[in-house]
C-alpha cells in the first residue's frame, strides 16, 4: 500500500520529470539562439583560401595580406568557439540521457517492489449493509515480502468480506512450480472466502501443458475456481452471487459461456451480483448484455506504460492507447466495470509510470 515514503518517491520521480523537461527546453533554445547563428557567421566570414591570399598579395601589397591573416585568425577563433559550444551541448545531452535513464530505472525498480491500494465506491440497489471486496489479479508469481507476508498483512488490515481473483496468478513458461501462489491463496483463505477465475496463463498451463491438477491444487489451497460457474456467499444477511466466465471473448459461444450466462440471467434471488472475467473486452463485447452490478477484470497490466496526461500505452486486445486498461468504467447495462492494473508482470517489458494495484471495492 502507498505509504508516506512511497508518496515521496513518486514525488521525486515527477520532480525529475519536470527537471528533464526544463533541460530539453534549454537545449532547444541553446541551439536555436546560439549555435545556429554562430555557425552561419563562421560560414559567411571564413578567411580566403591560400591561392586567394597569393592573388591579393600580388595585387594589393602587404597591407591586404596582413588583413587576410587577421581574418584567418578570427575565423579559427570562431571555429574553436563553435566546437566548444558543440562539445558543451554534447555533454548536456549525455547528462540528460543519464538523468532520464536513472529516473526510468528508479521507476522500474519501484514498480517491482511496491503497489498501491486503489479504492472504489459502488452503490447497490438491494444491499441492506455495505460489504468490502478485495480484488487481486495478474500476480504472475510476484512476491511482496517473504512468502507475500507484506501483501497478506495489508489485505488482512483491510478486513474484506470477500477476496476475488482475476486470474494469471502464475506465468506460463516459467517452470511448473507455483507453490508461492498456492501459499498466498491458503493465507488469503484464512482472512475471507476466496474465489476467482483462471487467466490466459492458467488456461495455457491447463489446456496446452496438460496440467489437469491445476484447478485441484487451487481448490486444495482454499480457492473456488469458477469455470462458467456461480458461487454464492452470504455477507451481513445479503446474498452475493459471483459469476465466473472462462476464457477470452472469442470463446464465448464455443466453450459454454453463453449458455451459462443465459441460464444465470433467469435467476433473481440474490441481493448483489458480481461478474468476473479475466479480459476486460469480454464485458464490452458480450457480458454487458446481462444483469449484474459490478464487473471485475485485469489482464492488461495497466497498459504496461502509462504516459502523463495520455494514459495507458498498449493492450493485446485493443492495441495502442486502449480504452480499458485500468480504472472504473460504465457499461451499457448500467453496471460498473473495474479493470485492475494487476500486481505483477509476465513479459520482459517493464512497467513504467504504472504502479501495480490492489483493488479495494466498497459496495453499499
Label the model's feature ranges.
Residues 119-134, 223, 230-244, 268-274, ...:
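Beta-strand-turn-beta hairpins that frame and shape the catalytic cleft
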Residues 130-216, 220-224:
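Membrane-embedded segments
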Residues 209-223, 235-277, 283-285, 348-351:
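Binuclear metal-dependent hydrolase catalytic cores centered on His/Asp/Glu-rich metal-binding motifs
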Residues 280-359:
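Conserved beta-sheet core of the metallophosphoesterase superfamily
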Amino acid at each position: 500500500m502507498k505509504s508516506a515514503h512511497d508518496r515521496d518517491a513518486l514525488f521525486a520521480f515527477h520532480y525529475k520529470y519536470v527537471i528533464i523537461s526544463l533541460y530539453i527546453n534549454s537545449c532547444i533554445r541553446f541551439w536555436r539562439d546560439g549555435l545556429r547563428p554562430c555557425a552561419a557567421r563562421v560560414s559567411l566570414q571564413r578567411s580566403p583560401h591560400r591561392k586567394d591570399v597569393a592573388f591579393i598579395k600580388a595585387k594589393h601589397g602587404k597591407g591586404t595580406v596582413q588583413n587576410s591573416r587577421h581574418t584567418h585568425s578570427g575565423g579559427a577563433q570562431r571555429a574553436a568557439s563553435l566546437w566548444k559550444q558543440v562539445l558543451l551541448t554534447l555533454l548536456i545531452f549525455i547528462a540528460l540521457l543519464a538523468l532520464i535513464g536513472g529516473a526510468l530505472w528508479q521507476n522500474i525498480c519501484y514498480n517491482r517492489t511496491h503497489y498501491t491500494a486503489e479504492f472504489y465506491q459502488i452503490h447497490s440497489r438491494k444491499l441492506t449493509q455495505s460489504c468490502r471486496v478485495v480484488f487481486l489479479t495478474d500476480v504472475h508469481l510476484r512476491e511482496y515480502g517473504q512468502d507475500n507476508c507484506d501483501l497478506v498483512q495489508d489485505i488482512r488490515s483491510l478486513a474484506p468480506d470477500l477476496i476475488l481473483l482475476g486470474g494469471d496468478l502464475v506465468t506460463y513458461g516459467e517452470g511448473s512450480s507455483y507453490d508461492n501462489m498456492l501459499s498466498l491463496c491458503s493465507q488469503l483463505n484464512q482472512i475471507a472466502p476466496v474465489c476467482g477465475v483462471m487467466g490466459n496463463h492458467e488456461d495455457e498451463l491447463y489446456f496446452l501443458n496438460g496440467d489437469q491438477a491445476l484447478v485441484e491444487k487451487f481448490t486444495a489451497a482454499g480457492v473456488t475456481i469458477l469455470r462458467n460457474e456461480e458461487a454464492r456467499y452470504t455477507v451481513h444477511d445479503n446474498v452475493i452471487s459471483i459469476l465466473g466466465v472462462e476464457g477470452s471473448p472469442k470463446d464465448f459461444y464455443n466453450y459454454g459461456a453463453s449458455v451459462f450466462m443465459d441460464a444465470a440471467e433467469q435467476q433473481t434471488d440474490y441481493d448483489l451480483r458480481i461478474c468476473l472475467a479475466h479480459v476486460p473486452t469480454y464485458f464490452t463485447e458480450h457480458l454487458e448484455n446481462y444483469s449484474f452490478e459490478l464487473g471485475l477484470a485485469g489482464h492488461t497490466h495497466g497498459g504496461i506504460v502509462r504516459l502523463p496526461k495520455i494514459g495507458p500505452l498498449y493492450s493485446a486486445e485493443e492495441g495502442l492507447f486502449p480504452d480499458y486498461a485500468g480504472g472504473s468504467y460504465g457499461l451499457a447495462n448500467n453496471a460498473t466495470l473495474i479493470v485492475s492494473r494487476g500486481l505483477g508482470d509476465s513479459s520482459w517489458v517493464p512497467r513504467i509510470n504504472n504502479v501495480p494495484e490492489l483493488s479495494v471495492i466498497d459496495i453499499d
